[in-house]
Every structure is written in C-alpha cells, then in structure tokens.
Amino acid sequence: MIKKKILVPIDFSDCSINALKNAINIAKKMDRELLLINAFLVPVTHVEFGGATMMGEIAHEMERNIEMQFRRLAKETPELKSVDYEYTMGHGSASDLVYAALEDHDILMVVMGTHGAKGIDEILLGSNTYSVIKSTDVPVLVIPENAGVHNFNKIALTSDYKDIDNLKIFDPLIQFADTFHAEIDVIHFSSNDKLSHEEIDMAKNIENHFKKVRHSYHVSEVSDNFEEAIEAYINEHNIDLLTMIPRKHNIFDKLFGESSWTRRMVFHSKTPLLILPT
C-alpha cells in the first residue's frame, strides 16, 4: 500500500531543519513518508551575451550544490534514518514547487518552518505562499524557528461555529490528536458570552464528531482584541499547537488580514500553527 507523504519545503537553514525534525516525528507516529523539496532561482542573464548557455551552467552548478547539501543533511540529521523519505529540487519559488508536489503526489500535509515575525509575514502574507495556505486541500503545519520538536499534547482549536458545511473539515485535526494522544480545547471567542441557537446546534454537532478524542469547550468573551485573547489562552493553558480554519470573515481573517497584527502572530516564536483546509 502506498503511504501518503508529508511535504517539507527545505532551504537547509536551522529553521527548516527544525521543521524537518518535527515532520520526522509526525511521520514516525503516523507511519508516513517524507518528501523534501528545495526550490532555487537561476539569475536571469542576457541572451545576446550567451545567457542561455550560462544559465544552464549556473543551474547545473546549483543542482550539484543542492545535492551536496542534501547528502550533508542526511549525515547531520540521523533522525532521517528512522523514516522513509525522498528529496527533489526544482527551479522556481517554494510555493511553485509546493503546488507541483500537491499535484504529483498523495500529500497528507505540508510542514514548513518560519523565521519569527519576518518569516510568518513571508509565509502568510507573501502573494504566493499565502495563497497556498488559503487554497490548498491539505493541512499546513507552520513551525516557528524556536519551537523545538513538539509532541503536541495540548491543542487549541479556534472556532466561530459558523459556516461549517462539512464536519469532515476537522478530520485531519482529529487524526492528529489521536496520533499524539492529545487533548483538544475548542475555543469560541465572542463579543458576548452567549451562543446563538445556530452556534449551539453546531457546537452539538462538533461534540458528536469529536467523540473519538479528548476535548473540551471554552467560551471566551473579548472585544476586538482577539490576538491578545488567543495569546493569553495559549500561555495560560500550555497549548502546544494552535489550529485555525482560513475562511473569509472569520477569526483567521481578523488575525491574518492585511491590516492586522500578523507580524506578531508567532507568539514569541514558540507556538506551531496548524491550518486546516476548507
């Protein structure tokens, strides 16, 4: 039986290697394979000065260097020996290669690293990669640079209980929590502490859907400062993983919209973020 793969974009930085180590941990527990991808861009040169030939030579040299870096990575990351993996490289942006891999392989999830506030800005607001997160049909796990390797014992799910057409959207999270024997805190942030009839009905449906894993419900009354409320909850309840659903006009857009506090989202670069596909 062909195993689904966990896709890991890697640039050989400490940040991406940390994300890789988290992906290895997940792959071992879920019995999955890893697919490592590296993207590179060849400098543009003028054709009239032999640019085509020069670009070919530069690309070949870059591929040789990347091949050497992959071999060095395998030697310096002994954890890789515990899982099946393959690696590939390609010319283009990282998001281009992610799209291609999602088309060509059976991908379970994407695991990617981020360099603090700058990195989360590049990942979530960059024109290409942000569109990957918003439109991909697999979960994306973002690992902050200083997060270390997590066992994800305590997971927080932010939910507004609205516009959820299919509860299967939560299945990747349930599988993740079941694998790590984790507890899920389902948090509803609201401007008041009362749920509407629609929200109560959806909460009951979610309750039934989550019966396989340990979970609890929490309603938090906040005004407009959702980011402080989430950060406080994470710190007070020792949350290892924050889970969100990217839909228009919900808390995800409040946090990641152009005019929001995106650059502070990493919460001191310690809390991984799981984004579920819609």
Q: What residue spans do the PLM features occupy?
A:
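Short beta-strand elements of ligand-binding domains
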Residues: 111-114, 140-145, 245, 273-278
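A short acidic, glycine-rich active-site loop
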Residues: 54-68
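Structural beta-alpha unit
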Residues: 1, 22, 75-110, 212-262, ...
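Local beta-strand N-terminus motif with an aromatic residue
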Residues: 3, 106-108, 129, 138, ...
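Small/aliphatic-rich secondary-structure junction motif
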Residues: 1-53, 154-220, 239-241, 268, ...
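Glycine/threonine-rich flexible loop motifs
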Residues: 119-124, 252-256
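Short, structured interface segments
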Residues: 129-146
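Charged helix-capping and loop-helix junction motifs
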Residues: 125-128, 200-203, 257-262
